[in-house]
Amino acid sequence: MTSRIKLSGLISPGLYDVHRAVRSGTVDEIVLAGGRGSTKSSCASIELLLLLLQHPDCHAAVLRKVGRTLRTSVYEQIAWAVSALDLSSRFELTVSPMRAVYKPTGQRIMFLGLDDPGKLKSIKVPFGYIGMDWFEELDQFSGPEEVRNVEQSLFRGGSFSFSIKSF
């Protein structure tokens, strides 16, 4: 039996328009700004998971400037979203390597620190392509050129791409 989740209970009313735009497919990037308690990270994690489910050949990369901050921030945020969307039985979350795998398809959400952006050049997935990214704490990155270089390393093919940037 499948349960129905009310997204209105998970996403702040101030972000409903963002969700509607993502759902309609009219945007390929969202930028979420706000302070603590703004629920921007909750929105980002939910949208990333929902998009992953809609694109079975696509994988995702979740990025922070400093790798040691991944586990206590975006990894835990994705774990929360998996649970909130009642998907816990369908995902395997591991910390070494740090990733979330959607068991029915093998799609991966990888968590990457950009302490050394050169490491991204050799990133591979077992099938399909990396088509989604989420830059958390965007203001910690060096600027648009660094973000563009990362996206060029990640988005190397595939028919779909989507970027989430939050700060």
Segment roles from a protein language model:
Residues 1-167:
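Phosphate/NTP-binding elements of NTP-utilizing enzymes
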